[in-house]
């Protein structure tokens, strides 16, 4: 009976440690962007927003116009010309409140109308707040 209790306790400790390690893992954020004029103010706003989360995020930036950026696009299956995509834990779509938000293109109201997405910086901050709340 004592051995069973020790085994059960050991299993509980291992499960607890693995859950704790998972909870501490930073949220992965990947940003594909075009490194030129019209997008630069948006990139600055995104960097400012991401900096609020410190080590709760693991952020990587990929310049659309470089060979590394092209490889990243291929890895993500992107073939179209898009100025900006933000993936949060491997998805460009997040549920923000009751709506699905896709972080593609310029934020609403900024940049050329043709390239505007249907998201705002507030949507991005809210999505990041949600995924980092438990970290």
Model feature map: region roles:
Residues 1-5:
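Positively charged n-region of N-terminal signal peptides that target proteins for export
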Residues 7-16:
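Bacterial N-terminal signal peptides
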Residues 17-23:
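Sec/Tat signal peptide C-region and signal peptidase I cleavage site
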Residues 24-53:
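Local sequence-structure signature of Cys/Sec-based thiol-disulfide redox active-site neighborhoods
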Residues 31-37, 61, 72, 109-118:
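Second-shell loop/turn segments in exported
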Residues 43-50, 66, 70-73, 121, ...:
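Extracytoplasmic/secreted envelope proteins and their assembly/folding machinery
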Residues 55-69:
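Thiol-based oxidoreductase modules, predominantly thioredoxin-like and allied folds used
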Residues 87-135:
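Non-catalytic, surface beta->alpha helical segment in thiol-disulfide oxidoreductase systems
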């Amino acid at each position: 009976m004592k051995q069973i209790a020790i085994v059960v306790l050991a299993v509980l400790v291992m499960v607890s440690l693995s859950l704790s390690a998972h909870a501490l893992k930073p949220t992965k954020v990947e940003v594909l962007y075009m490194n030129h004029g019209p997008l630069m103010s948006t990139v600055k706003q995104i960097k400012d927003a991401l900096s609020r989360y410190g080590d709760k995020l693991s952020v990587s930036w990929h310049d659309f116009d470089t060979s590394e950026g092209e490889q990243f696009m291929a890895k993500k299956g992107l073939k179209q010309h898009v100025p900006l995509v933000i993936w949060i834990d491997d998805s460009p779509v997040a549920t923000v409140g009751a709506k699905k938000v896709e972080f593609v293109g310029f934020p609403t109201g900024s940049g050329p109308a043709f390239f505007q997405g249907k998201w705002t910086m507030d949507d991005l901050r809210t999505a990041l707040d949600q995924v980092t709340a438990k970290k």
